[in-house]
């Protein structure tokens, strides 16, 4: 019979003429009759309209034998569900009234080739021709029972079986509705146009499984598939959807071969292969019951309890049988199953079945023996010997365990879908006819298929039963997790559902040993905050983590970006934050010293100025040149004041005052000193040439010259104001160190180092010029005592500013630039002012206060005395002296008496002329 089926399948697919098929019917009839003599192989129920049924009543047989042991749940439960549905429909006056549904139910033995041979029974009536002229080899006409016409088929179960059967049913336009086949390829309406199913395809299931895996944070999984259409196509769909979704990688795809010599060794090898990628703990399984059981057993033998995270397809569902004796290795397994509900009416129906009231089921006696582990004395077919005999009084659910099989609901829905289609077809074609009218009998499968695709009713679970254009049912799944710890009822727990989108109650989930924390199945642990992923070529789920360095932050998982100019990375480098703004604070050590010196200087300056004002008409004050002394003291005071402006918090007003007073104090001081030294120099130079007094040596002239020199500084400042108005800035370059944590923005006036030097440059020029005059007047006699202190002042000041320049510019790249430069500048100005104050005025103040007896006018100087001193000084400069240290020079000066009659003879007296 097997070889006949294969031959007929080939001939049918090759579209041989019907006459050839007619000849083969003789052989088919004889073979069918012979098989009926061997054992009953189908269920026949008479009716006005006959539906075919394909169920895996038996498992695959060993090599050479088509069928094996009976399958109690997947086989008998589902078969009885069809019988139950037929009873309900035939007793329903509102569904197919006056029409009785019959059935021809066959066993597929869980094998696609055997199912194909069995399904030829459904097409016999369609290829039946006039056989009056047909003779068998012995000359006799063929003898066979006229087959009933099957208008539609319920089944099959396995996807590979449905694919094989669908190929032949479509040739004869027989609609087919499956209750369990989920292979995605069956959605191809061009190849399987007469195929429909009340369960969603694996493409929906695969999408749901991808959503589950991603919801749990897993991105590195392995797949395991039973060889065949269901397993391989399911994994193919899962892989394709995961690629489209992104963020999910397949570590390895393992296929379980169908033909195995040693099951134990093969499954142990599979577990070892899965362990080659230890980070891929999640295993997505599309496998049959037996393969699931064997893989769990192999994992237990490998002592991998708790390692693998199983994600099972609907072939696993909520079944208990595959987990028997392997509950510990299966704990935490997540399984998916088309949304279903227990059909209570079926439970009552099935538990009431006995050998007496269920004779229509030709396999029920065999089920009875298997279910109650007994042996029937007459019609039993149980192979193994047993001492216990079946009494026939056993009861299902009472004397044996019973739990409704998961696909019972879908079998019932499939039968009802066919019934509703026939009902609408009957109403349209047989409106005025009771029963099946000729039009309906001749309508054909294509018309029935149209009605099937348009059915819409509430199924046994209360959910709508409908089909899309490809014949697929909507995707509705329940999601379970197998839990044995921390529960009073170990078993499958409903943790979510999927209907186009995932709803998962993660808080209800637990894993091995009752752990609530979701285990990981990732190639590489997520990068820490502030690190970016650098993916490995070919494995986007595997990466190395590279820290964002410098002023970079983690922009996204793959990218580090630089923070804006005025920001730095936050602590974990996940974003940017503003760089702290700093300025020189009053309490800073860098500010305390300059402020202290400035305050001392200001006090001293005020004291000197007050003393000079108090003793304004005394000889020492008058001899110092009162007008320029007050100007010089004002400049010294401003040199001290600039310290406070340099440390004050920058704003527009402070910055404006900085520009004005930065060089003004020094300019006033050195302008006054320059005027003094220039006056001394001109007087003595003029004295060498003539007895006529030089011009512009009066106090008014001296003030005018000093004011002119100062006005140049002020003019430059006003031009600076016009070209570049004062403003405040935040300088981020100054303190932008290699370590962003130490980065600071410096709040300061918009004054560059070059502008500072330019502002001080004019004052430095005055200082240098004054120093030159101090050098030139170094030979002035001691009686003209203003020149020497000025000279010492200028020498010291030059040393101070020569030290200032390298310090100021040498710290341009230092992190402490703000502090060092400000402190250096203010201290330099304080020292310059202090040197001038100390050398020029402190000795005079000391005499005024502590030795007032010396503050008297000794003699009046006339310009004649100055000329005489200048002449003698000139002579001495050209005549070598035998006395060291200028003693001769002093002696000569002392011998000159400007009050002698000779001196007064030719010259006018300059009693009020002060040097």
Curated annotation (Swiss-Prot):
InterPro entries for this protein: ANF_lig-bd_rcpt, GPCR_3, GPCR_3_9-Cys_dom, GPCR_3_9-Cys_sf, GPCR_3_C, GPCR_3_CS, GPCR_3_mGluR7, GPCR_3_mtglu_rcpt
Amino acid composition bias (Basic and acidic residues), ranges on this chain: 879-892
Chief place where the protein resides: membrane
Primary gene name: Grm7
Cytoplasmic side: 616-627, 676-702, 776-788, 851-915
Gene Ontology BP, a term: associative learning
Protein name, per record: Metabotropic glutamate receptor 7
Transmembrane segments: 591-615, 628-648, 655-675, 703-723, 754-775, 789-810, 826-850
Extracellular side stretches: 35-590, 649-654, 724-753, 811-825
Subcellular location: Cell membrane
Gene3D superfamilies from the UniProt entry: 3.40.50.2300, GPCR, family 3, nine cysteines domain
The UniProt record lists the keyword Nucleotidyltransferase: no
Spans annotated as Disordered: 874-895
Subunit structure and binding partners: Homodimer. Interacts with PICK1.
PROSITE patterns in the record: G_PROTEIN_RECEP_F3_1 (PS00979), G_PROTEIN_RECEP_F3_2 (PS00980), G_PROTEIN_RECEP_F3_3 (PS00981), G_PROTEIN_RECEP_F3_4 (PS50259)
Gene Ontology molecular function: any one: calcium channel regulator activity
Residue list for modification Phosphoserine: 900
UniProt key word DNA-binding: no
Disulfide pattern: 67-109, 249-541, 374-390, 430-437, 523-542, 527-545, 548-560, 563-576
